[in-house]
Amino acid sequence: MSMIAAFYSNKSILITGATGFLGKVLMEKLFRTSPHLKVIYILVRPKSGQTLQERVFQILNSKLFEKVKEVCPNVHEKIRPISADLNQRDFAISKEDVQELLSCTNIIFHCAATVRFDAHLREAVQLNVTATQQLLLMASQMPKLEAFIHISTAFSNCNLSHIDEVIYPCPVEPRKIIDSMEWLDDSIIEEITPKLIGDRPNTYTYTKALGEIVVQQESGNLNVAIVRPSIVGATWQEPFPGWVDNLNGPSGLIIATGKGFLRSIKATPMAVADVIPVDTVVNLTIAVGWYTAVHRPKSTLIYHSTSGNLNPCNWYKMGLQVLATIEKIPFESAFRRPNADFTTSNFTTHYWNTVSHRVPAIIYDFYLRLTGRKPRMLKLMNRLLKTISMLEYFINHSWEWSTNNTEMLLSELSPEDQRVFNFDVRQLNWLEYIENYVLGVKKYLLKEDLAGIPKAKQHLRRLRNIHYLFNTALFLIIWRLLIARSQMARNVWFFIVSFCYKFISYFRASSTLKV
């Protein structure tokens, strides 16, 4: 029997960020492997027109929880939603709910964060730093708490090329940053943001680094650990391959490529695509919770959940497999035939963004206007290019993460636990994973039926014919404008045609000679 699964039986668990991608998969795995756990508290932000219980039912009614309902039919009774807002002081939780959390919680998984790369520094500090500080304060008042697991990111120290399993200092103390956010106005914060984040690419990575320091400084006597995942992608194995429900990371790129919106991207083809399946991150996180509670390490251990140093895959290989899979199972209503090229220079990137992205969008918007519809393609394309520009830093660099603690933890698990909570990324078959990823994007994100594949292929053939027709027409126009009006151009043209004719004639004659 799994020791880890048995450990979580009869436990009361608090999960922040449970309505997010990682949080949902974490909750599903806990219920599926430990159906006898006592309760999972989830902090849910109030939403107008929807009760907390309705939001829980919405989560449970997704395909992700189908297997859970078989092993834990009363799962809805074991989820206790608590109205909370991490943007508010003390999370705006009622006194009754606070008292219940303080007296009952055994394990905390802190998954909540803002993952927006362009978030204002005030917002990023509130969700990634201040909220962590407040949760630690609450945790310090929980007499039954056994472990506090903080989910950070492997890119919290992306300004370094080699990252160890340690917490790196920041020039300005987190407490000073938190205090300054309370009285500085937005314009001043925007002005000082570049100086604060330094050589990090955005406020997300900077504030996640601050959050780690807060965990180290303010955890007191708590048993704490930090998990640092890299780019979190679709499920690898559990509860089934390819499940994904957000546009973050590779998912948005796959859709943009498959729909024909994205034809060129600035990236280093041989750079490591450090994507990690979400179920791998979840299995490691659950194992870390068990190890931290049972073995009570003397210091805060950091665990890297990354793939590049153990089972690397580069962006070129990933791109080829994405295109090969899309050719077999194309997306419906594609804007253009799927194709994607890597560029490495700024000039080439700007050129293709204009010629291959914005100009076709403008032409399509003109067509929409002619047919009496609202133009939208250029606006959509500009949003896409802005998103891509924020990802460029991560697809043009490679990092090395040490994984000593992760490998140590794997060796501590029994064979049964290694099977049930598998986070050994060395077993991952990238070609198979990427194919399932693309299929999952089609089924779970785009909600497209596989029965529509023949029609989608027919649509792509139509787009191919339009492409050939357009190129032919463009060639004839250029010929008419340049060659037909210039004697020199005609001479060059006739020379090329004559040369090609003679070459073909020579090739045919030589191929008939008998040796």
UniProtKB/Swiss-Prot annotation:
Kindly report every residue range on the membrane side named Cytoplasmic. Answer: 1-464
Question: Transmembrane region positions?
Answer: 465-484
Q: Where in the cell is it found?
A: Peroxisome membrane
Query: Which keywords has UniProt assigned to this entry?
Result: Lipid biosynthesis, Lipid metabolism, Membrane, NADP, Oxidoreductase, Peroxisome, Transmembrane, Transmembrane helix
InterPro entries recorded: FAR, FAR_C, Far_NAD-bd, NAD(P)-bd_dom_sf
**Gene3D superfamilies per record:** NAD(P)-binding Rossmann-like Domain (3.40.50.720)
Residue ranges annotated as Peroxisomal topological domain: 485-515
User: What chemistry does it catalyse, as a reaction equation?
Assistant: a long-chain fatty acyl-CoA + 2 NADPH + 2 H(+) = a long-chain primary fatty alcohol + 2 NADP(+) + CoA; hexadecanoyl-CoA + 2 NADPH + 2 H(+) = hexadecan-1-ol + 2 NADP(+) + CoA; octadecanoyl-CoA + 2 NADPH + 2 H(+) = octadecan-1-ol + 2 NADP(+) + CoA; a very long-chain fatty acyl-CoA + 2 NADPH + 2 H(+) = a very long-chain primary fatty alcohol + 2 NADP(+) + CoA
Give its E.C. classification number: 1.2.1.84
Q: Which GO terms describe its cellular component?
A: peroxisomal membrane; peroxisome
**Membrane topology (UniProt):** Single-pass membrane protein
**Pfam families in the cross-refs:** NAD_binding_4 (PF07993), Sterile (PF03015)
**Knocked-out gene: effects:** In the knockout, the meibum lipids do not melt at body temperature, resulting in plugging of the meibomian gland orifices and the typical evaporative dry eye phenotype.
Tissue localization of expression: Specifically expressed in the meibomian glands of the eyelid and the sebaceous glands of the skin. Also expressed in the brain where large quantities of ether lipids are synthesized.
GO terms for molecular function, please?
alcohol-forming long-chain fatty acyl-CoA reductase activity; alcohol-forming very long-chain fatty acyl-CoA reductase activity
The Gene Ontology biological process annotation of the record reads: long-chain fatty-acyl-CoA metabolic process; wax biosynthetic process
Please indicate if the UniProt record lists Transport as a keyword. no
Q: Which family does it belong to?
A: Belongs to the fatty acyl-CoA reductase family.
Q: Tell me, in a sentence or two, what this protein's role is.
A: Catalyzes the reduction of saturated but not unsaturated C16 or C18 fatty acyl-CoA to fatty alcohols. A lower activity can be observed with shorter fatty acyl-CoA substrates. Can produce very long-chain and ultra long-chain FAls, regardless of whether they have a straight or branched chain. It may play a role in the production of ether lipids/plasmalogens and wax monoesters which synthesis requires fatty alcohols as substrates.
Q: What is the protein named? A: Fatty acyl-CoA reductase 2
Which source organism?
A: Mus musculus (Mouse)
